[in-house]
C-alpha cells in the first residue's frame, strides 16, 4: 500500500512538474581565504583620490594602508612606506602608482616565500599563492606584457606545484618543491627581485 502511494505521489508530481525535493542552496568549500588586504582594499580609494587630485582623500586612503606598509618597510623592503609618503606629499600620481607597484611586488614575494615555507600544508600554501595572484592582478596592467605573461604562467605553475590532497585521497598529488622553486624564481626575476 505504501509503495502504491509513493508511486502515485511521484506520478502526480511529475505530471504537475513539481520538484520532488525542495530546492536548497548549494554550499561549497574553498581553501582560499579572502581575508582583508588593506593594500588591495585601499588601492581603489587611493587611486581614485589621486586621479581626481584630492590629495587629502589620498592621505586618508593611505592611512588605511599604513599598517601593512609599515610591516613591509620593517620586514621586506626598507623604504616602501616612505615611497608612498613622499609621493603623496609631492602630489605625484605616477610616483603613487610606482609606490603601489613596489609594495604589491613585495607582497607577491612575501606570499610566495610563505607558501614555500608551508609547502607541506596544502591549505596554507594554496591560500598564500592565491593571495600572491591577487596582488599580481592588481599590477599586471602596469607590467611589460612579456613579464606579465611570465608571472601569470609561473603563478599557475606555483599553484599546481602546491599539490592537492584530493577527495578522500582520490586525485591526491604531493607538493613539488622543485617546480615551486622554479616558478618562484621566474616570478622574482620578472619583478626584478633577487631570489
Regions inferred by a protein language model and the residue ranges of each:
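C-terminal segment of classical bacterial N-terminal signal peptides
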Residues: 15-25
